[in-house]
Swiss-Prot record:
Keywords: Cytoplasm, Methyltransferase, rRNA processing, S-adenosyl-L-methionine, Transferase. The gene is rlmH. This is Ribosomal RNA large subunit methyltransferase H. It comes from the Bacteria. Its main location: cytoplasm. It is an enzyme of class 2 (transferase). It comes from Prochlorococcus marinus (strain MIT 9301). SUPFAM superfamilies: alpha/beta knot (SSF75217). GO terms for molecular function: rRNA (pseudouridine-N3-)-methyltransferase activity. The keyword Ribosomal protein does not apply. S-adenosyl-L-methionine binds at L57, G86, L105, S106, P107, L108, T109, F110. GO terms for cellular component: cytoplasm. The keyword Nucleotide-binding does not apply. Its EC number is 2.1.1.177.
Length: 138
């Protein structure tokens, strides 16, 4: 079973759009253990350990459907899963190279603030799938 206390989102910058912040807060209420940090820069040294997985979001990344994403996250067993979201310019090639996985949410390009909301919804959906909750309808 996938649990939100093993998941964290690290994103560059603050959310300025109120409607996105409200959407994120709705999912945060459902997953209070989920860590969401707004940063100025990424420090991979703090995230890198034997028990951590780093997943960087980029439009060039690998795409999964919701069930496949759930399966992927479940395969990481007891590891802490850290998602990195860049700013308007994305993440650097250095961060992508040092990540365990580069993930794309879609072939479409989204503003970085909206990508956070979509990622949080997909995390909630993955948790729901792993718990056999009726939220996900395939």
């Amino acid at each position: 079973m996938l649990q939100s206390n093993r998941l964290a989102i690290y994103a560059i910058g603050k959310i300025k759009k109120l409607w996105i912040r409200d959407g994120i807060n709705q999912y945060k209420k459902r997953m209070p253990e989920l860590i969401i940090n707004e940063l100025k820069t990424f420090n991979l040294n703090n995230l890198r350990s034997n028990n951590n997985i780093i997943i960087c979001l980029s439009e060039e990344g690998k795409q999964f459907n919701s069930v496949e994403l759930c399966s992927l996250l479940l395969n990481f067993k007891n590891k802490k899963i850290n998602f990195l979201i860049g700013d308007t310019d994305g993440v650097s090639s250095d961060i992508k190279e040092k990540s365990d996985l580069v993930l794309s949410l879609s072939p479409l390009t989204f503003p970085h603030e909206l990508a956070r909301l979509i990622l949080i919804e997909q995390i909630y959906r993955a948790i729901s799938i792993s718990n056999n909750s009726p939220y996900h309808r395939s």
